[in-house]
Amino acid sequence: MIGLTPSQKGAAAEAAITSAVIQLGLTVLRPLCEGRRYDLIVDLEPRLLRVQCKLVRRRGGVLMVRLETSRHTPRGYVFTSYSATEIDAVVAYSPELNRSFLLPIAEVAGRRGVHLRLEPARNRQSKGVRWAEDYSLERTIGRLRNGQTAPLLDEGQLNSPDQISGL
């Protein structure tokens, strides 16, 4: 992705994530207007999942997922993170691996970033480690399709059974 603008990198990540979700047999919806915190909606039937797409960098054995956005104001930069009122999940795409990873908002809300480990740490730390494979898009969607509970089904506005039945 060398030489691409940030917008082009974001568009490439969205396209790769959209393709991966469609290959899993799901429908992807795109908002007609800009300005929302989510990039895509994944139809899990009957639930809708608001997804923020991210391009991730690999540094050694770690995927670094940035979860903070910034904008410049007259008073300086303003940094914001994501919440369950805005999105239901972050899907991070790694062009180096050509794979996507789904992170429920319950695990990343308010955070500046998350590291997903691809290989064990050199210091053998295992406590608090997020293994990338545990968050693979295929595995996470498979759990959701099999009716297994996951934190992301209990978070966010569109995942509320009351709101789904009222649509």
Predicted stretch roles:
Residues 1-29:
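Acidic-basic catalytic patches of nuclease active cores, encompassing PD-(D/E)XK
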Residues 17, 21, 40-42, 47-57, ...:
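Conserved catalytic cores of phosphodiester-cleaving nucleases, focusing on short active-site segments
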Residues 20-22, 49, 65-82, 118-125, ...:
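Conserved functional hotspots at enzyme active or ligand-binding sites that engage polyanionic ligands
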Residues 24, 36, 86:
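Short beta-strand or tight-loop elements
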Residues 31-35:
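Catalytic phosphate/metal-binding cores of nucleic-acid and nucleotide-processing enzymes, i.e., regions
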Residues 36, 47, 96:
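A generic "binding-loop/recognition-motif" signal
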Residues 54-100:
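Catalytic cores of nucleic-acid endonucleases
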Residues 97, 101-167:
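Non-catalytic C-terminal interaction segments of nucleic acid-processing enzymes
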